[in-house]
Amino acid sequence: MIDSSKKQPQGFPEILTAEDFEPFKEKECLEGSNQKSLKEVLQLRLQQRRTREQLVDQGIMPPLKSPAAFHEQIKSLERARTENFLKHKIRSRPDRSELVRMHILEETFAEPSLQATQMKLKRARLADDLNEKIAQRPGPMELVEKNILPVDSSVKEAIIGVVKEDYPHTHGEFSFDEDSSDALSPDQPASQESQGSAASPSEPKVSASPPPVTASTPAQFTSVSPAVPEFLKTPLTADQPPTRSTAPVLPTNTVSSAKSGPMLVKQSHPKNPNDKHRSKKCKDPKPRVKKLKYHQYIPPNQKGEKSEPQMDSNYARLLQQQQLFLQLQILSQQQQQQQQQHYNYQTILPAPIKTDKNSSSGSNSGSSSSMPARRPGPLPSSLDDLKVSELKTELKLRGLPVSGTKPDLIERLKPYQEVTSSNLATGSIVAVSSATIVTSNPEVTVALPVTTLHNAVTSSVSTFKADLALPATSSVPHVENAHSPLPISPSPSEQSSLSTDDTNMTDTFTEIMTMMSPSQLLCSSPLRVVSHDDSLSPSSSTLSTLELDAAEKDRKLQEKEKQIEELKRKLEQEQKLVEVLKMQLEVEKRGQQRPPDPQPSDPPHPFNTSDPKHGSVGSSIKDEASLPDCSSPQQPITVPGHSVGQPISTGSQTLVAKKTVVVKQEVPMAQAEQQNVVSQFYLSSQGQPPALVAQPQALLTTQTTQLLLPVSIQGSNVTSVQLPVGSLQLQTPAQGRVQAQPHVAAATQVPAAALPSALTSALPQKQEAFPQHVLGQPQPVRKVFTNSAPNTVLQYQRQPGPTNQQPFVSKTSNPALQSRTAPLAPLQNGPSLASKPSSPPPPQQFVVQHSLFATPITKTKDPPRYEEAIKQTRSTQPALPEVSSVHSQQMDDLFDILIKSGEISFPIKEEPSPISKMKPVTASITTMPVNTVVSRPPPQVQIAPPVSLEPVNSLSASLENQLEAFLDGTLPSATDTGPLQNSSEDRESFSLIEDLQNDLLSHSSMLYQSHSPMETSEAQLVSGTPCLSLDLSDSNLDNMEWLDITMPTTSSGLTPLSTTAPSMFSADFLDPQDLPLPWD
């Protein structure tokens, strides 16, 4: 074996080549090195092992002198002792709750949210500690100076030399922070000068980011306005020589810094990491600030460069932040008080310009440290009459040096005197009562609540841009359109829906004040006043740029906090409103009619406190109807019964993003004719006093709530119905903007018995309007079905009139006018009109809920409950089948008369069966959440006139008279769109007469019920016989309220329906199973 192993290496060269042999060599080398390292480790271990004596001392080995058993005993004793010690420790350890309280253990049983907040607090505390340590760590210059950082000696000398050169400038930067620490009270004089250092171009470090120079609008307001903020003071430019000219010229360096990027005011001096002054003085609890009295004043040219102790930049920044925050707080408080006391702005004259002459980098600290807390008043005309002491006090108030002879003092005060007189001469009205006049570069942001001067009401805040005119004498911007009585219409991208009606503003305001907290009446979105740098004349140098980067940040933080608070407040208000509306629903269900509200004719007065750019939720509270969003910013909205078409500046795409909460106030029928924006719709029956018109309890559209239009109807025959639903902000899916619904300007109701002349309804009011305007716009089919006594079925069809003579119901070649032959599927929260192949998406139908009280009662009595109503409905059924014989003959007579008199052209249509003629048209109006409001088509109203028993001659005569009266009363004197829209609805309202024979539906498939959980009740419209369906909706015609029928008096509704006249309902229509009443 050994021989063979010896021989084997000799055969290797034959088998393996040299390359194959290399790995083996490497392996051997590795093994050898490993053994070497192991040897070394072993050697080290042996060297470091403890001696026998040490092991004995530690009780590991028994001592040589004593026996081993004794050693074992000692060991067991020691073990027992440590065991006892541990047991004692375990017994005496604190309770778990104590450990949790000391934050050693985490609470496991506590709520997760509580734990999360605790963890956040803990992290915040740690972060604060870290930030403090980081803020107080020495800067690199300090480390170099104290030889902590190893730097070459030549570099170190050069750095120290540069720091010494920079020292006067950095010192000047801090004099502002030292002095401004006094100016915390609102009564502090406005003349306290803030100073920014304008770095000279010779300093490469500083000029890389030139510090901003404070520019001011030295606005000393009247007693109404708050004290001028600390940051609105005249600049002390560091390089400016002491002169006595009235308009100090900014050095070129200052102008360049005015155009540079926005700087922080908290760091009014850019934080230079290479500055020497980053010391740890901040750790001292009370940094020493040297205060000079006035008699110790030294002119700046004689003052030693390093005469005052410098402040640490961290502390200076902290002081400045605190001051700015306090000033903003004080200003906002004063603004709140001011706006609560005086709702309209008083004339505010700009204050005198405070020019600084003898100012250099360090002069300010001595002059302004102990200023009296009194505002500088206007100077008298002749300064020579003043005593020297008075002149000195005036100088002190303006922060000027008081040393020198009387002529010197007068000379110093003269510029202020001239400026005051010139400003008084201009007498400009400046509505700058805002807390933040802040410039970020060329843009001055001024928060100005837009008010109407007559009404003392803060209507809203519109965001717009106005050029800032800078007069040569005063540097306060004259914002001239801040006082326009109508709201300023913003650019389309920045919208806010404003509507101001001067007559009713104060009433609306008092009501809104009850709903909204006063802080929401303050300005929440700032006006942006853009100042152009070209307009900076030498005298208006005080507006170059404010040293306000920190103020910007503070302001942004505060704005965010305010927004959060406002959103919280709005949430609470919405919850309160929901509660109120629930209460009102309860009250309405019990039939307790309320006394008339004190503001019957309030216009919609939306409060849109949110900045449209942020897209935050604006809650708009409106009386009677929400303001419809026009499709163009200046488009007038036709308000029925109110002949002023007021331009309402509303938006297009931007407002779609807002969820507006529309709250309708309840106003009883006694004042129904006075309401401006309510769409009223009466059906009063003959021989009985009209019942109280039911008011919509709520139209609250939030993201999840559904439209609810409860209408309670009293009396079996008394059918006065008012549906102010013009405020539904709906829209056909084809259009991309929110549109207001067109209002139906009058209902056409054929008298059911011999009519008293006072009660003849506005049936032909539409007839004269047909040829007047070419209505090329197709109008949406509208159906409203009031679920009440037998006489109240109305059918109303809006049709496009392509030409003057075109009948409303005619078979045109328009493919969209398809006859509705197929029955409609029940609508489940969405538009689904069946069998209209070529029409655009059909208009959405909405559920209008009515609670049916079917007993004739007077206004004061409660309506019957639900069960009684059902019984009474059943009791009315036997009278129903008398309908069929009368109906078609009466309608044919009516149509003949109308066609002969030329009011309508003869329609080409099929004669439907008499069974279909007697069928009423019902409306199913399904509810949808608000997020679909933008794409929602307009509601459909179809009103079917009942039978007429009156001779048609007197009817047509009364119709023409009524038309003139109606047109006089209702057509608003707005711009061109107003009459066009009204005439369109005129024609549309009359279309029901022609539509009647086509649109009355087949007997069998008349009613579908949609039983989705929110849509409780109305019967579904189904079409059996051929009839024309107009599903086209138009944007121009959608700018009017729908169902907008304003009557001359409360007693004259639409045509009274006699109680004895046969009804149009078929018997199975009023079957309680077909007509669910879900109002529980």
Swiss-Prot record:
Tissue: Widely expressed. High expression in heart, brain and testis. Lower expression in lung, liver and kidney.
Gene3D superfamilies tied to this protein: 6.10.140.2040, 6.10.150.10, SAP domain (1.10.720.30)
Residue numbers of Phosphoserine PTMs: S66, S531, S535, S537, S913
Stretches assigned to coiled coil: 539-594
UniProt GO cellular component terms: cytoplasm; nucleus
Covalent cross-link site, Glycyl lysine isopeptide (Lys-Gly) (interchain with G-Cter in SUMO1): K622
Subunit structure: Interacts with MRTFA and SRF.
Domain notes: The N-terminal region is required for nuclear localization and the C-terminal region mediates transcriptional activity.
Protein name (record): Myocardin-related transcription factor B
Species: Mus musculus
